[in-house]
Amino acid sequence: MKASELLQKDQAALNKELADLLKAQFGLRMQLATQQLTNTSQLKKVRRDIARVRTVMTQKANQK
C-alpha cells in the first residue's frame, strides 16, 4: 500500500489496517517457522507496510 493512499484514510481505518497487517505478519511468521512459507519476501513487504501505516499515524497525530 502506498503512503499517499494511507494519508487519505482516517484514524479508525488506519488502526484497522494496522491490525490486519499485524495478523498477516503473525501468520507469515508461523508459516516460516513450520517451513510452509515459500515466498519469504512477503515478510519484508508486510513489515514495511506496517512501518508505513505507523508513520502515517504518527504524522497525523503530530498535526493536531
Curated annotation (Swiss-Prot):
Q: Which organism is it from?
A: Burkholderia multivorans (strain ATCC 17616 / 249)
Superkingdom of the organism of origin: Bacteria
Name the chain's protein: Large ribosomal subunit protein uL29
CDD domains reported in the protein's UniProt record: Ribosomal_L29_HIP (cd00427)
- What HAMAP family does the record tag this protein with? Ribosomal_uL29
Give the residues annotated as coiled coil.
none
The protein's matches in Pfam families, at most eight in alphabetical order, are given as: Ribosomal_L29 (PF00831)
GO cellular component, as recorded: cytosolic large ribosomal subunit
